[in-house]
């Protein structure tokens, strides 16, 4: 309960469950840590040359789902649990919200395009999230989304109507890329 006082100061009349308070304390700890890093970079004259990239790889699964839904005030569909926010920050950066589907494979091309706008990143499986090309995300269960529609492997469809053939072509391409990733991760480059 190191940060309980800060949570109580922010929410003086809170009647949150202990799990929610514990989660909030972890967020305070993260915020404090980022602040310390920024202060140190600023003191060393390096803050202007730093890009912060923050990406949670999951929703707060350590929380009871019903409790989490009560806290955020909405009921979440299973597919929505996979939606996460990528935060990128640099000094002087103009704030912008970009709502496009993406996954971890899209982070490197996005960062590289911010640093080098040539857009020549053919060796990456992902794509620049700030680009104009429509992006699709393949999940570990091989379901696919373009942010508007969601196709599961049993061909259950959620969201807006779409061209099934086009989705199947993208699905095949994404699965092929996934196979390449597996080969890369499972190979011993230095042995061969």
Residue map of PLM features:
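Solvent-exposed soluble domains appended to multi-pass membrane proteins
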Residues: 1-192
């Amino acid at each position: 309960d190191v940060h309980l006082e800060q949570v109580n100061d922010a929410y003086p009349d809170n009647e949150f469950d202990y799990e929610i308070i514990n989660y909030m304390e972890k967020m305070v700890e993260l915020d404090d840590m980022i602040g310390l890093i920024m202060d140190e970079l600023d003191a060393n004259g390096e803050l202007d040359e730093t890009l912060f990239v923050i990406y949670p790889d999951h929703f707060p699964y350590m929380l009871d789902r019903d409790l989490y839904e009560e806290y955020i005030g909405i009921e979440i569909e299973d597919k929505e649990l996979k939606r996460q926010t990528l935060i990128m920050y640099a000094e002087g950066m103009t704030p912008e919200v970009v709502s496009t589907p993406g996954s971890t494979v899209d982070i490197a091309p996005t960062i590289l395009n911010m640093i080098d706008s040539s857009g020549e990143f053919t060796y990456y499986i992902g794509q620049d999230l700030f680009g104009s090309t429509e992006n699709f995300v393949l999940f570990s269960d091989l379901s696919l989304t373009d942010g508007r529609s969601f196709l599961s492997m049993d061909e259950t469809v959620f969201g807006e109507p779409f061209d099934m053939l086009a989705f199947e072509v993208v699905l095949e391409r994404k699965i092929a890329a996934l196979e390449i990733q597996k080969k890369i991760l499972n190979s011993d480059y230095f042995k061969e």
